């Protein structure tokens, strides 16, 4: 079984970054101890653009945590700009790790 990663791209509304950071800190704290979660990171890819990255033991672990992650999104949804009508406020992708440099 291979590790599994998820990446969620989002764009914070103007003037809402501090509030978003506070809510995401609470979300990260809430996710601590989630079965199979190895790590979570937040990177800034532009002035208002961010990606949340999760590393998981396996695909089953992320599947079990999906409801918890969706609930976390619910706490920040109002702070995010719509990326597009098709995507909404997030652009999530996930998949197995196929190469890793240790």
Label the model's feature ranges:
Residues 2, 9-11, 38-51, 75-102:
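Glycine-rich beta-strand-turn "strand-cap" elements at beta-sheet edges
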Residues 2-4, 33-34:
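Short, flexible segments with low predicted structural confidence
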Residues 11-22:
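Short, surface-exposed ligand-recognition loops at beta-strand->loop->(often short) alpha-helix junctions
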Residues 13-15, 45, 57-59:
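Short coil/turn motifs at secondary-structure junctions
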Residues 18-20, 52, 62-64, 102:
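Short acidic, gly/pro-rich beta-turn/loop elements at beta-sheet edges
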Residues 26-39, 55-91:
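An amphipathic, aromatic/His-enriched active-site/gating alpha helix that lines ligand/cofactor pockets
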């Amino acid at each position: 079984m291979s590790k599994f990663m998820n990446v969620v791209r989002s764009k914070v509304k103007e003037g809402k970054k501090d509030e978003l950071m506070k809510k995401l800190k609470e979300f990260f704290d809430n996710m601590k101890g989630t079965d199979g979660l190895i790590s979570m990171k937040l990177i800034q890819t532009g002035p208002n653009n961010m990606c949340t990255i999760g590393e998981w033991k396996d695909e089953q672990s992320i599947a079990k945590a999906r409801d918890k992650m969706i609930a976390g999104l619910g706490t920040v949804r109002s702070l995010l700009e719509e990326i597009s009508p098709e995507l909404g406020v997030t652009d999530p992708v996930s998949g197995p790790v196929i190469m890793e440099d240790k």
